[in-house]
Curated annotation (Swiss-Prot):
Cross-referenced Pfam families: SYY_C-terminal, tRNA-synt_1b
Record localization: Cytoplasm
Chain ranges of the S4 RNA-binding domain: 353-419
Positions with a binding annotation for ATP: K234
Family affiliation: Belongs to the class-I aminoacyl-tRNA synthetase family. TyrS type 1 subfamily.
Catalysed reactions, semicolon-separated: tRNA(Tyr) + L-tyrosine + ATP = L-tyrosyl-tRNA(Tyr) + AMP + diphosphate + H(+)
Gene: tyrS
Function in brief: Catalyzes the attachment of tyrosine to tRNA(Tyr) in a two-step reaction: tyrosine is first activated by ATP to form Tyr-AMP and then transferred to the acceptor end of tRNA(Tyr).
Protein name per its UniProtKB record: Tyrosine--tRNA ligase
Assembly and oligomerization: Homodimer.
Length: 420
């Protein structure tokens, strides 16, 4: 099967240049690229779709280039932005670029036989560029009218856009040209907001290769949306990162398992490597047995394992199951730290402290009276076990690896006692 057929079946193709020519070209191996600017020290799930697109092309026998924007990251892409980006110091951007390189290595095979992926950093050519030569040889191929007409620029004109960000599309176009010259790269892929920058690159290569048979292509993926109208990739706690130190595998797993029924089939197509037939089967279950949430569980399993590995995925599933069944006592200290990293907590040194007082210290209740009433009514659980004895001390309670006590008051309010 031509990879374009699979991508279209999954809804992953938003726009392409000359689709017929691209389809024919993809019948044999080709080199393509996608760029990732280091705007933070980690990629987030908004980057996941294009990253997985590179992986899909590699699995189909093509050669992907992951381009880290060590140079363009110093400028800032205006696409999709309503205001000027904050410019970061060079050393910070290069440090972030190195961390992003490490993350990309988890998704692509850079040492495989036949079609190993290529890692590049555009700082290699943008960092040493000669301004006069660049304006003479590259700048003359861009008309001000076409640059102003690009959506990423036009949408910012009323609010103001600096020459720095205005020139970004020229730099991205130059990247495509350099990768074409260095590696024979014939296609750039990106999000739908990158269409203007991508076509600027194809136009530049065409103008720079008059008389040569150099045909290049562009492909964009759709914007990932949520049916409830909220922004994809954002939670109450902020962005969902691919770095487990910024978003734990458990929180990452929870993001996917909480997917709306209206979105889950789309996300299975976008973010997993399950076959179209497997996804169709899960889609039928969403219609006939939505309460089982099998599609959401499969989505969370596949994406968490893809990003964080089998062990982290199993740990996330274990924490989720413990919270659902009340089996907190079966968790390890590491799992407790991961699963309860953002609940109210307090350090307790005196293990002779009454549980009633520990409830006050972690913020579960505001007074001893409220603590006693909550316990006597059966609303307080310690490590999954209901506690009604108001005379209990911390020392008398079971602990997780002698380090933690997990308190639940009511159905969903959790608190963590850390023994020090």
């Amino acid at each position: 099967m031509n990879i374009l057929d699979d991508l279209k079946a999954r809804g992953l193709v938003y726009q392409t240049t000359d689709e017929e020519a691209l389809y024919k070209r993809l019948e044999s191996p080709m080199t393509l690229y996608c760029g990732f600017d280091p705007t933070a020290d980690s990629l987030h799930i908004g980057h996941l779709l294009p990253v997985l697109m590179l992986r899909r092309f590699q699995l189909a026998g093509h050669c992907p280039i992951a381009l880290v924007g060590g140079g363009t990251g110093l400028i800032g892409d205006p696409s999709g932005k309503t205001s000027e980006r904050t410019l970061n110091p060079t050393e910070v951007v290069q440090e972030w670029a190195n961390r992003i390189k490490e993350q990309l290595s988890c998704f692509l095979d850079f040492e495989g036989v036949g079609n190993p992926a290529i890692m590049a950093n555009n700082y290699e050519w943008l960092g040493t560029i000669n301004v006069i030569e660049f304006l003479r040889d590259i700048g003359k191929n861009f008309s001000l009218g076409s640059m102003l007409a690009k959506e990423s620029v036009e949408s910012r004109m009323s609010r103001g856009i600096s020459f720095t960000e205005f020139s970004y599309q020229i730099l991205q176009s130059y990247d495509f040209l350099k990768l074409n010259e260095l590696y024979g790269c014939e296609m750039q892929i990106g999000g739908s907001d990158q269409w203007g920058n991508i076509t600027s690159g194809t136009d530049l290569i065409r103008r720079m290769s008059v008389g040569e048979d150099r045909q290049v292509h562009g492909l964009t993926v759709p914007l990932v949306t949520k049916s409830d109208g909220t922004k994809f990739g954002k939670t109450e706690g902020g962005a969902v990162w691919l770095d487990q130190d910024k978003t734990s595998p458990y929180k990452f797993y929870q993001f996917w398992i909480n997917t709306d029924d209206r979105d889950v089939v789309k996300y299975l197509n976008f973010f997993t490597f399950l076959s179209i037939e497997e996804i169709q089967g899960l889609a039928q279950e969403v219609e006939s047995q939505p309460e089982k949430r099998n599609a959401q569980r499969m989505l969370a399993k596949e994406v968490t394992e893809l990003v964080h590995g089998v062990e982290a995925r199993e740990r996330a599933e274990k924490i989720s199951q413990a919270l659902f069944t009340g089996g907190i006592a079966n968790l390890t200290a590491k799992e407790v730290e991961e699963g309860f990293s953002d609940v109210p907590s307090a350090d307790v040194e005196d293990q002779e402290m009454l549980l009633v007082d520990a409830l006050i210290k972690v913020g579960a209740v505001s007074s001893r009276r409220q603590a006693r009433e909550s316990m006597e009514s059966g609303a307080v659980y310690v490590n999954g076990i209901r506690q009604t004895d108001t005379t209990l001390t911390v020392a008398q309670l079971d602990k997780i690896e002698s380090r933690f006590i997990v308190i639940r008051r009511g159905k969903k309010n959790y608190y963590l006692v850390k023994l020090v």
